[in-house]
Amino acid sequence: MEFVPCRKCNNGWLYKMTDDGMVAVECECHKKWDHENTVEKTYKHNGFDIRHYNYNPRTYAGTKSVKDKDRIINYVEQFDKNPAVRSLVCYLYGPNGTQKTTMMSWVGHQLLDKGYSVRYMLMNDLVKLLMDAEDFNQEKAEKAKAMVEKLEETDLIIIDEAFDKEKMKLYRSGYQLSYIDSWIRRRVGALNKGIFFVSNVEIKNIEANGLSHSIQDFVEREVVLHNCYLQFLDNYMQSTVKEFDGSLF
């Protein structure tokens, strides 16, 4: 992000004469640029797709899920006003192409801008990380454990492609399920920190997608308890293709 100074300063600095001589004071335009630059770098580092960085919910395409879109906007507004919101387990369901990931990337951007720590990751990557933390290879395990500890300190974790057997590598033995179950319960119960699941799988079908009844029961109970089940049902791709009558080649 290139810095463009305002008309008042000299490349981001204001020079004032004091009793001790000339003093350089950082201009507000440079402070703003520095903050935005830091947020953008953190956004990319924390797993978000930079293509969604400047997304604006006002450009949301569709009419079926406007109410839930507005609820997500309110979630962001309440995040720093109401501590209870920071510990919620939320679930955003919708078929492919319904702008779920794009909207949640906006959530990440807004909360990072407010000074909170937010991480975006796929559930398959989370499972792999939890398994690596128990690996016999000490170096590999220690590296994974350090990352797991960072996740514990993170204010909000957005988990995409959640509970989708087509997007997760689950062994027939199902031994990974205990890792997922324990991690979710610890984050919600012991750490009292929030999770925002994003999924193509309806919450009532988690078990049918190869996960355990225990996981579905816990997640469903936490989500329903606080009325945090949201749906995006407007297929952005279908509406775009329908409206687009030209060709680029």
Regions found by a protein language model. Give the residues of each.
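Conserved RecA-like P-loop NTPase ATPase core
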Residues: C9, Y60, M104, L122, ...
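Short, catalytically relevant binding-site loops at active-site mouths
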Residues: N96-T102, D125-K128, D164-K165
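Loop/turn-to-beta-strand initiation segments
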Residues: Y116-S117, E153-I157, A190-F197
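Pre-Walker A (pre-P-loop) alpha-helix and adjacent loop at the N terminus of AAA/AAA+ ATPase modules
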Residues: T59-C90, H109
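A short, basic N-terminal segment
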Residues: M1-N74, Q238-F249
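Short glycine-rich substrate-engagement loop in P-loop NTPases that contacts/grips substrate
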Residues: K67-I73, P95, H109-E153, L170
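Walker A/P-loop nucleotide-binding motif
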Residues: V85-M104
